[in-house]
Design a protein with these regions (language model features):
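Cyclophilin-like peptidyl-prolyl cis-trans isomerases
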Residues: 22-433
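Bacterial N-terminal signal peptides
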Residues: 6-16
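N-terminal secretory signal peptides that target proteins for export/translocation
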Residues: 1-4
Length: 433
């Protein structure tokens, strides 16, 4: 072998060794520590890290890694795994369907969705429907990738979230898509007030922006003179996402909640996200007040993983000006005296008589469409501490999960499906356990 060939082979060997030494291994995703729980529960089976498959060019991704968790979430929510082989993919349906192209869209577009025509030959129509069932706009004979700003006029000036429904003939198809304009809420106007039959004071909300909550209240006129004008509202973009209900499984039965992004978009999205990601699992209803001091139906409150009434998600939400009335079955955010202090704790109203005074003071963001027996059963839980509303045995929230919402129908307000109570104040609710 010539000296030239020997030198070339030696240099090649040195280059390969150096290249291998400088290539870091892909670190394995750590298994998270189990979260602390307020009550003793059986320890879960430890997660077994899969062994490395030496036939692969990359390490096997651990089953608990963020990559796999996100893939499974998308599979559950969209009913299709984009990374699965073509032969094993599960179709959403054989009929027509639609999906958002992305979650966030810029204010001037494109605002796109993907429409699958399906097997039927009849043309498809898109309807933009508000919460009252009024059709705000429509586009006919649509399919493929559609820019909504080009086919539905007025969508760029939406003030509240609306629902995009796919229709074939006279039949709505599948789950609607929420079209939510991203707007900052107007500044909240407050004053110090005294609670009825008490000397205690609290922060009372009296208006939003330049609009008072009670235009007939003469005391607000002086307050309005001190209000500093906020920035004019603008649309910073859009959120587009599949409409989902939240199924709350408790040891008293199930409660199905329809969200109201048209009233409180950020609050509804926060609750949906915490529910989807398991924040509420194994928490409970730590405060049960079936009736207030005047005997009027009041609230059941939950959403605190510590079950103390002081826990939360580690952040606070800006209060939103929801006008959804606090009626039986309506879900709203609990908070401290500071208006922008809500996080994860929520409550269900038990009756208009006792909770009408909460309108405008607390942010209602949805309503139960099934589960009145469970709500009434929780409200009938024996109380150990009446002053605090502390139950003797805290009703447990086993899990929460997202389920696809039903189609939106023109001319129909889904709030008509809100649950009705099965009992009267003072009666014992029939348990659904």
């Amino acid at each position: 072998m010539s000296n030239t060939i020997q030198i070339a082979l030696l240099l090649t060997f040195v280059f390969v060794v150096n290249a291998q030494a400088q290539s870091p291994e892909i670190p394995a995703s750590p298994i998270p520590e189990p979260a602390a729980v307020p009550t003793a529960r059986p320890a879960a089976n430890p997660v077994q890290r899969p062994e490395r498959d030496t036939t692969r060019t990359r390490p096997v991704v651990p089953a608990d890694s963020p990559e796999v968790t996100e893939r499974l979430r998308r599979f559950r929510e969209n009913t299709i795994d984009p990374n699965a082989p073509q032969s094993t993919r599960v179709p959403v349906t054989k009929s027509a369907s639609m999906r958002p192209a992305r979650l966030y869209c810029p204010p001037h577009g494109p605002l796109e969705i993907n429409i699958r025509r399906g097997d039927a030959g009849e043309s498809l129509t898109l309807m933009l429907i508000d919460r009252n069932g009024e059709v705000l706009g429509m586009a006919k004979d649509v399919q493929g990738r559609v820019n909504l700003l080009e086919v539905i006029s007025g969508i760029d000036s939406l003030e509240h979230a609306a629902w995009l429904q796919l229709v074939q003939g006279d039949h709505p198809l599948g789950t609607p898509i929420v079209i939510q304009p991203i707007r900052e809420p107007p500044p909240v106007r407050t004053t110090r007030a005294t609670r009825p039959n008490s000397t205690a004071t609290f922060t009372k909300i009296i208006g939003w922006g330049d609009r008072p909550l009670d235009a007939d209240d003469p005391t607000i006129d002086e307050e309005r003179k001190t209000w500093i004008a906020g920035d004019p509202p603008i649309i910073s973009g859009f959120k587009t996402y599949t409409d989902m209900d939240v199924l709350i499984r408790t040891d008293h039965g199930e409660i199905l909640v329809a969200l109201a992004p048209d009233e409180a978009p950020s609050t509804a999205w926060n609750f949906r996200t915490l529910a989807r990601d398991g924040f509420y699992d194994q928490s409970g209803f730590h405060r049960v007040v079936p009736a207030d001091r005047e005997g009027k139906p009041f609230v059941i409150q939950g959403g605190d993983p510590t079950l103390t009434g002081n826990g939360g998600p580690g952040f606070a939400l800006a209060l939103e000006p929801s006008t959804l009335p606090h009626e039986y079955g309506v879900i709203s955010m609990a908070r401290a005296d500071e208006p922008h202090s809500a996080g994860s704790q929520f409550f269900f109203a038990l009756g208009r008589e006792g909770t009408a005074r909460l309108d405008g003071q607390y942010c209602s963001f949805g309503y139960a469409v099934s589960g009145s027996r469970a709500v009434d059963s929780i409200a009938a839980t024996p109380i150990a501490d009446i002053a605090e509303g502390r139950p003797a045995n805290i009703p447990v929230i086993l899990t929460m999960q997202l389920v696809t919402a039903p189609a939106r129908m023109p001319g129909i307000d889904r709030r008509q499906d809100r649950i009705k109570t099965t009992t009267k104040v003072g009666e014992v609710a029939p348990t659904s356990r």
